[in-house]
Amino acid sequence: MRLIKSSIVLFATFILIFSLAACGKSEVQKVRVGEVTHSIFYAPQYVALSEGFFEEEGLEIDLQGTFGGDKTMTALLSDGIDIALVGSETSIYVYAQGATDPVINFAQLTQTDGTFLVSREKVENFSWDQLKGSTFLGQRKGGMPQMVGEFVLNKHGVDPQTDLELIQNIEFANIANAFASGTGDYVQLFEPTASIFEQEGKGHIVASFGKESGHVPYTTFMTKESYIKENKEVVEKFTRAIYKAQKWVETHSAKEVAESIAPYFEDTPIDLIETVVERYKEQGSFATDPILDEEEWNNLQTIMDDAGELPTDVEHGILVNTDIAESVISE
């Protein structure tokens, strides 16, 4: 009789363990994330992946390249992706078009511009007024890089419309190749391209747009309002994983960060990744928490307005949800 009871208890325990395992397995949820471009600038996102922070939260991330703000928004609005990593200006453009299901910024990843000014010739004692009379190969009109670029030029007394020849009709993916082929005296580039050009003697980094522009919600995670309502727990878990990664990046060296994200940049030498990470850490480009505050939001709209690209002024609370980030941080 005792043997039978023991067998029953053992069987029940097995069933319980199996059920819990099955239950845990079913809780893993796939989240499709579209990134506007693939860049070391987004290091905390790759740390969240490589260090298993998303996995700890029961999330499986399907990371997709959407390449361009307009394409990223199209993918999000058409349910091709669940969450977008893109500049906050895109949410304002969508809102201004009368969207019935607005796109909400819920977790900030980068807090400065991520581009650098690269000159074709080596420049001694660089000053911004040296751009006057030059040909400047900028970024796509209406995107954050171009708007920040114009904002910084104006800040230093250089009118991008009259003081230089501004080229901004080249596709994002082709800008670096255009400069390498001989177009422009100066170009605005992301890393690691800027450092690669410097190593190869194709250009020289002379200034940082991130240092000059101040804090701005340059790249944030956003999703449709309806997705947050229907998947609030998923968004909370996602934000928690990002916050863990942000603190990890903040407390680890550039070398350690480079080693963590290297699998996502197989064609980039590890020492170059480290150089780029150090540069971004030094200028405070990586947000240390996911909260997009009102001051940053207003700075964004000032930059958009100065560039003539702000379709309508939008209050912080309309397109920004800080409740989720604040809740995660307070845990």
Give the positions of each predicted feature:
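Short, low-complexity disordered leader/linker segments with a strong preference
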Residues: M1-K30, V328-E331
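Short, glycine-/small- and polar/acidic-enriched structural segments
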Residues: Q29-Q161, E165-N169, A178, D185-E191, ...
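Residues within well-ordered alpha helices
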Residues: V47, F53, V152, I196, ...
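Secondary-structure end/capping motifs
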Residues: K229-P311
